[in-house]
Amino acid sequence: MLISILIAGDLVPHERTVPLFEAHKTDYLFGDILSLIRESDFSVVNFEAPIVLDKLTPIRKSGPNLYSSLAAMEVVKDAGFDMITLANNHFRDQGQSGVCNTLSCADSIGLNYVGGGKNLEEARKINYQRIKDKIFAFINVCEQEYSIAEDEYGGSNPYDLINIHHDIIEARKRADYVILIIHAGIEHYP
C-alpha cells in the first residue's frame, strides 16, 4: 500500500500576498500545486509567521519580526494541509501572545500542529497520525535562535540531539514510521 506524504517548506504571508490571504484566494495563491497538496494522503507545511489578533508585540531580535493572521491559517487549511510545523526561527517573533494566538487559532479550526507549544513540554510533544492504517510519529525541531520554548514560556521545540534521540526512541514504541522535520540553515540560502 502506497502512502503519499507531502512536506512543504516555509509559508509566510508577506507584502503582495497578504491581501490574497486576507481575501482567502487559495486557488490563486497555490495554483498548480494545490492538486498535489489535496491528492496527498497527508500534507504538512511550515507556518513560519505567528498570528497576531490585536496588535503587534514584536520581540527584540536580529532580523525581521514576522506575523500573519487567522485568515492565513484558514487558507492553509482550505488548501488541504493536514498539519503545520511550528519549530522555526520566527515562531516567537510576536512574543508569548503570538505563540498563544497561533496555537489557539490552529485548535479552533482543527488544524494539527507539531513543534510548538505554550512551554517546552508542549513544544516537544510528538504528533501521532493514523494514515491509511499506519501510525506516523512527527517530530519537529529548529535551531536555537530567538524562538525556543522554555519551561515558563512558549515557543519552538529546540534542536537538541539528546532530546531528539530520546523522542525518536519514544516515537518508535507507538509508531510504524517516524518523521523528523528539522528547520535549520542560513537565511536566504536554499
Q: Language-model features: where?
A:
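N-terminal active-site segment of His-dependent metallophosphoesterases
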Residues: 1-66, 166-170
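Active-site environment of divalent metal-dependent phosphoester hydrolases
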Residues: 13-16, 51-54, 89-103, 120-125, ...
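Divalent metal-coordination and catalytic microenvironments
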Residues: 10, 45, 86, 90, ...
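Binuclear metal-dependent hydrolase catalytic cores centered on His/Asp/Glu-rich metal-binding motifs
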Residues: 18-31, 66, 130-180, 186-189
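Active-site-adjacent helix-turn-beta-strand microarchitecture at beta-sheet edges
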Residues: 83-138
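Hydrophobic structural segments
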Residues: 6-7, 12-13, 66-74, 112-114, ...
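Active-site-proximal segments of metal-dependent phosphoesterases and phosphodiesterases across multiple
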Residues: 55-77, 177-190
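Surface-exposed amphipathic alpha-helices with a cationic face
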Residues: 34-38, 43, 77, 103, ...
